[in-house]
Amino acid sequence: MTMKVKLLTTSVALALSMTAFSSNAVDFSGYFRSGVGVSQDGDMQTGNQSLVGRLGNESDTYTEIGIGQEVYNKDGKVFYVDSMFSMQSNGSNDYESTATVCDFDKKQCSEDATFALRQFNVKAKGLISAAPDAVVWAGKRFYQRHDLHIIDTKYWNISGAGAGIENLKAGPGAFSLAWIRSDGNDIDNSIVDNDLNVNFLDLRYAGWAPWEGAWTEAGVSYAMPNPTDEQKATGGKYDPENGVMLTAEMSQYFAGSGINEKLVLQYANKGLAQNMISQGGGWYDVWQLTDDAKGYRVILTGDIPLGDKFSVNHVFTYGKGEKLQEWHDNTELFSAVARGGYAWTDIMKTLVEAGTYESTKTWTSGAEDKSSGQKYTLAQAWSAGPSMFARPEIRVFASYLKDGEGESFNGGEDDSTWNFGVQAEAWW
C-alpha cells in the first residue's frame, strides 16, 4: 500500500509539473533542405560547397529540429531547456531510416539515414546578482557559431558538450567563457583506446563599437588534449601539444548605402592550424603529427545592395598553413564565392552564384599537389519575401561545375559536368 501511495504521489507531482511547464509556449525552430536533381551522367554530382558555393550544389536531405521551453521564471530567475535533433540522407528513396542494410558477402554495411543529437542543454539567467543579464549554461549545444551561409561553413565553431557563462557585461561589450569537449575519434588501430579526449577553453569579448556602424568581437579558443596513461606511453598522435586559435573580427554597416561588410582575421597552431586551409571552424586534428603546425586566415564577407531589387552576398577567403603533417611544407588556399539576387516581385527572384578556388600543397621534397575548380549556377526562386535570405524558398536551378586539375566528373572521364534540379530550403 505504501508503494502505491508513493507511486501515486510521484505521478501527481509529475502531472502537475508538466501542467505548469505547458503554460509557457514551446519554441519550435529548425532548418531543412531537400530536393531532386540529375546530372549529365546519372544523379547529381556535387562537391566543394565550402569552396565554390552551395547553390545548385547540394543533393542531400538535411534537417535540424529544435524544441525549447522556458520552464521557470520567478523573481528575475529564468530557466530554459533547449534541444535539437538532426537527420541527413541522400534523398534516394521514400523510406529512409536508421536500419542498417548489409551485404555480408562483401562485408559492407550502409544506412539510409543518420540521426544525431545536436543540442540538449539548460540555460539560466539571473543567477548572478552582480550580473543579472549573464547566462549560465550546461549541456550540449551549438556554441556561438559564426556562419558563412552561401558556402555552408562555420569559421568559428567550438561546439559540443560543456558549460559556461555568457553575456558578462564589461565596458561597452560582454565576455563569454566556456569549457567544451570535442574529442578526436578513431585515430588509428595501434591501440584499443584510440579516442583522444580534447577539451577547449573558449574566451570571447563582443560588442565594442569603435565608431558609428562598427561592431567587433575577439576571442581565444584553447585546445587541451587529455591523453590516458596508455596513450601517453604510445606517444606521437596520441600525445599532441595544446593548441590555440585566435580570432578577431570587425563588422561595418555603411549608413545610406545599406552595405554590410565583415573582416575576419585568424591565427592557429598545433592541431588547430589545419582549420585555416580546410574552411574549418575549430576541430582539433589528432590524425596527423602537428606539433610544429601553424597557419592563418583572412575572410572578407558581406552584403552589397545595388538598388531596391538587386543585392550581392560574397565570401572571399585566403588561408595558409605550415607543417600540418609529416613532410609537409605549406598549403595555400584562395576561395571566392558571390551570389546575386534580383527580386522581380515580393515572392519571386532570380539568383546567380559563381565560385572559384585554388589550393596548392607543397611538400618538403619540393613536390606540389594542386587542386582548383569553379561552379556557376542560375536559379529561379520563389520565397516568403524579396530579400536574398527570405525563407522558405523553392528554387529551380541549373549548375555547371569544372575541375581545374583533373577529370573527377562523369565516372572519372570528364573535367566538367552540369546539374539540373529543384530544391526547397527553410529555417524558422
From Swiss-Prot:
What processes does the entry annotate via GO biological process terms? Answer: monoatomic ion transport
Signal peptide (residue range): 1-25
Q: One Pfam family, short name please?
A: LamB
* Membrane protein topology class: Multi-pass membrane protein
So what does this thing catalyse?
beta-maltose(in) = beta-maltose(out)
Alphabetically sorted, this entry's keywords are: Cell outer membrane, Ion transport, Membrane, Porin, Signal, Sugar transport, Transmembrane, Transmembrane beta strand, Transport
Compartment(s) where it occurs, according to its Swiss-Prot or TrEMBL record? Cell outer membrane
Any Gene Ontology CC annotation: cell outer membrane
| Record site: Greasy slide, important in sugar transport | 31, 62, 427
GO MF terms on file? maltodextrin transmembrane transporter activity; maltose transporting porin activity
Which cysteine pairs are covalently linked by disulfides here? none
What are the inducing conditions? By maltose.
Similarity section = Belongs to the porin LamB (TC 1.B.3) family.
- What does this protein's UniProt record list under function? Involved in the transport of maltose and maltodextrins.
The subunit field of the Swiss-Prot or TrEMBL record says: Homotrimer formed of three 18-stranded antiparallel beta-barrels, containing three independent channels.
Q: What is this protein called?
A: Maltoporin 1
Organism from which the protein derives: Aeromonas salmonicida (strain A449)
Name the gene that codes for it: lamB1
